[in-house]
């Protein structure tokens, strides 16, 4: 059910420049306004391949959740309540499911770009503007045998990205920190798939940001144009021939959408637009094709008649005008898609799909890796970078052996990384595609292999083990990732023992019903696994929210009493 604002407020919104922008696009304002000004429904992505995914589905159904049918290639759900009006019991349950990595709260339209990209399951892909991480983690879930480079320039937002990676236990994600316009050089041949979810004015996000109604004017979209196209240009330089790149925004402004696409094609003649098959990818979703005849708007969003001269408006440049005005043949902008809130009870979104034309680059590598001038001498090995606090190194073989012997893990299933008291596990592709190869600079010299430089990699894979007084214990958030691989130090207990501990009892070792070694172990009760630390007592080493999941599954009230 959609709860629209009072009629008086809607009438005020009708007079805003934002409504003028929508009207200039041919949007039915009477149908659009009540939805575009109402709260969004709560939506989420269900984490695939978890052992208890059926249990999670049961919780969503019990709250009145329903599958989003038009997202047919992933499992997404919509709740029967809006974001600002979640019942208390549902709010508590959603928090438990989200924080333990069973769901990811995410707008439905935000899930479009990774689906449009359709990455191969063993490919190397990149998200250029990844925080807070909903699309990057969706990509990682889509390519379990591949690798995601998640880039974020802001340190604060990068921490959110790392939190979401850790919450979901993803070993196939690397987090790096670059200005998206200047992402570092990397090994040949480049990247197979890229998502550029560009920074934008968010004019399609009015359902969660009401300030836009009163704060937006056309100059805001123009102010984003250069940044958006610069980020996309750098991404296109890193794309392998035949590779795909998605450009997307949560804006309805053609300056940030179709005009940006035209500029990307002008600057990147090796790219072509690909027709997005929305009927196949999103069956039942109402979409609109991209346009090629957008109008010039003044600061009140009133259309300005073209007189042959560019109007003197804040930030307006020739490349922001539609191709018909510029006297140019328009690219097939109808290949791109727009989603409007009132058609599907969603937010709004714009998506374009590009392909690196293989014939445009017979060298078979990304454009940034082709020397502008042939090197007339032997290439020189460049000096290694000095290590710093962010430097991540492969774990020592003895350390890996210690962990794998303790827990019965096949070391070859992962690449192993060490920093401080943590050991991370990552996709083996991390070594073969990014760490071992040499990297050429723009002069033809090269940095030696066995380093990530010049990429500024901040986090590799999933933190999975912590050194605790000489014992390498598994981290609670990594348990789902480790579950299929751990074969030793699993201590079987009955439900009574587990329930007793979930009620708050921390038993002495001598009172524990089964023999258990000092240090780190994992309690197993049927399908339930719980890491513990054993000293004088046996103590849980999992988060309180994960304990709440165990309580719910075993019939123990989250408050501590048995149901």
Language-model segments: residues:
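Polybasic, low-complexity RNA-engagement segments
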Residues: 1-63, 306, 316-322, 327-331, ...
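Class I SAM-dependent transferase core
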Residues: 72-119, 161
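Conserved class I S-adenosyl-L-methionine
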Residues: 122-131
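Conserved SAM-binding loop of SAM-dependent methyltransferases across substrates and taxa
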Residues: 132-144
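Mobile active-site "lid"/loop adjacent to the S-adenosyl-L-methionine
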Residues: 143, 156, 189-234, 239, ...
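Short beta-strand element of Class I
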Residues: 145-149
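S-adenosyl-L-methionine
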Residues: 151-189, 196
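Conserved Class I S-adenosyl-L-methionine
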Residues: 219-223, 258-282, 291, 295-300
């Amino acid at each position: 059910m959609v709860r629209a604002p009072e009629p008086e407020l809607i009438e005020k919104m009708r007079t805003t420049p934002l409504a003028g922008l929508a009207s200039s696009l041919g949007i039915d304002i009477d149908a659009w306004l009540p939805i575009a000004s109402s709260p969004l429904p709560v939506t989420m992505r269900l984490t695939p391949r978890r052992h208890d995914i059926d249990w999670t589905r049961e919780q969503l159904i019990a709250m009145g959740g329903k599958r989003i049918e038009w997202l047919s290639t992933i499992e997404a759900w919509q709740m029967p309540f809006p974001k600002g009006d979640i019942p208390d019991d549902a709010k508590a349950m959603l928090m438990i499911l989200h924080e333990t990595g069973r769901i990811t709260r995410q707008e439905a339209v935000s899930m479009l770009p990774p689906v449009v990209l359709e990455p191969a399951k063993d490919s190397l892909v990149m998200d250029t503007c990844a925080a807070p991480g909903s699309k990057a983690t969706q990509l990682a879930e889509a390519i379990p045998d591949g690798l995601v480079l998640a880039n974020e320039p802001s340190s604060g937002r990068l921490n959110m990205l790392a939190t979401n990676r850790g919450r979901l236990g993803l070993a196939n994600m690397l987090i790096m920190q670059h200005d998206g316009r200047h992402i570092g050089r990397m090994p040949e041949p480049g990247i197979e798939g890229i998502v550029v979810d560009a920074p934008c004015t968010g004019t399609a996000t009015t359902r969660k940001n009401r300030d836009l109604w009163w704060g937006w004017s056309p100059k805001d979209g123009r102010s984003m144009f250069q940044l958006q196209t610069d980020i996309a240009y750098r991404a296109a330089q890193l794309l392998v021939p035949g590779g795909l790149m998605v450009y997307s925004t949560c804006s309805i402004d053609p300056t940030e959408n179709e005009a940006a696409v035209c500029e990307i094609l002008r600057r990147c003649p090796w790219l072509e637009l690909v027709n997005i098959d929305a009927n196949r990818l999103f069956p039942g979703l109402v979409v609109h094709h991209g346009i090629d005849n957008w109008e010039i708007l003044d600061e009140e969003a009133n259309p300005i008649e073209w007189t042959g001269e560019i109007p003197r408006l804040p930030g307006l440049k020739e490349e922001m005008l539609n191709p018909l005005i510029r006297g140019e043949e328009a690219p097939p902008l109808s290949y791109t898609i727009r989603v409007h809130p009132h058609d599907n009870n969603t937010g709004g979104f714009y998506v374009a799909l590009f392909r690196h034309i293989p014939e445009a680059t017979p060298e078979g590598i990304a454009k940034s890796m082709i020397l502008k001038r042939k090197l007339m001498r032997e290439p020189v090995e460049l000096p290694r970078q000095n290590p710093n606090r962010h430097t991540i190194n492969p774990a020592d073989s003895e350390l890996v052996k210690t962990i794998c012997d303790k827990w019965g893990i096949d070391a070859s299933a992962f690449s192993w990384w060490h920093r401080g008291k943590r050991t991370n596990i990552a996709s083996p592709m991390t070594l073969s595609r990014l760490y071992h190869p040499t990297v050429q600079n723009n002069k033809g010299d090269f940095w030696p292999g066995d380093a990530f430089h010049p990429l500024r990699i901040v986090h590799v894979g999933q933190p999975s083990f912590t050194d605790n007084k000489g014992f390498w214990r598994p981290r609670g958030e990594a348990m789902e990732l480790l579950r299929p691989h751990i074969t030793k130090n699993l201590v079987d207990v009955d439900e009574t023992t587990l329930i007793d501990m979930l009620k708050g009892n921390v038993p002495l070792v001598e009172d524990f019903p089964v023999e258990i070694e000092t240090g780190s172990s994992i309690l197993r009760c049927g399908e339930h696994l719980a890491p513990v630390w054993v000293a004088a007592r046996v103590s849980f080493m999992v988060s309180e929210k994960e304990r709440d999941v165990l309580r719910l599954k075993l019939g123990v009230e989250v408050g501590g009493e048995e149901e």
